[in-house]
From Swiss-Prot:
Protein's name according to its UniProt entry: DPY30 domain-containing protein 1
Alphabetized UniProt keyword annotations: Cell projection, Cilium, Cytoplasm, Cytoskeleton, Flagellum
Cysteine pairs bridged by disulfides in the record: none
PANTHER family the record matches: DPY30 DOMAIN-CONTAINING PROTEIN 1, DPY30-RELATED
Native organism taxonomy: Eukaryota, Metazoa, Chordata, Craniata, Vertebrata
Length: 177
């Protein structure tokens, strides 16, 4: 059982150590073999530490890569979000401009409607005034103007001018002074 244990745990170490003793041929081979085994153990321990350190560095590198990928994804998402917000803001601005344009059009239509109503009212008034003037002109015509008979006298009409009254003249003099 001891030989199996020695072969399993110390077989490679003892084989290499004895080969080294045979190659170097020291004065005290037992002491040399003992020192060589200590050095071998130290080398194995250092190799294990180096392997652990390499594994740790590899894990840290993988974590750094994952973190970098995550940061890139976050930046991409943030950029996408900013673009969406900008698009939304532009859409809202366009809607606001469209709403203002519609309000301006409605105001213009209302103003145009008011102007058209006023024009229609003025037109109706003007027509009423024209009809009343025509009626007054017709009533103010002389019999000769109304009748188209041959031989009716054709006299021109003379309009009377308002003569200034004495009080109007006095007011004009006061204003001149």
């Amino acid at each position: 059982m001891e030989s199996i244990y020695l072969q399993k745990h110390l077989g490679a170490c003892l084989t290499q150590g004895l080969a080294e003793v045979a190659r170097v041929r020291p004065v005290d081979p037992i002491e040399y073999l003992a020192l060589w085994i200590y050095k071998y153990k130290e080398n194995v321990t250092m190799e294990q530490l180096r392997q652990k350190e390499m594994a740790k560095l590899e894990r840290e590198r993988e974590l750094a890569l994952m973190e970098q990928e995550m940061m890139e994804r976050l930046k991409a998402e943030e950029l996408l979000l900013q673009q969406q917000q900008l698009a939304l803001q532009l859409e809202l601005e366009m809607q606001e401009k469209e709403r203002q344009r519609i309000q301006e059009l409605q105001r213009a239509q209302e103003q145009l409607g008011k102007e058209m109503r006023m024009n229609m009212e003025n037109l109706v008034r003007n027509e009423d005034i024209l009809h009343s003037e025509e009626a007054t002109l017709d009533s103010g015509k002389t019999l000769a103007e109304i009748s188209d008979r041959y031989g009716a006298p054709n006299l021109s009409r003379v309009e009377e001018l308002d003569e200034p009254m004495f009080s109007d003249i006095a007011l004009n003099i006061d204003q001149d002074l």
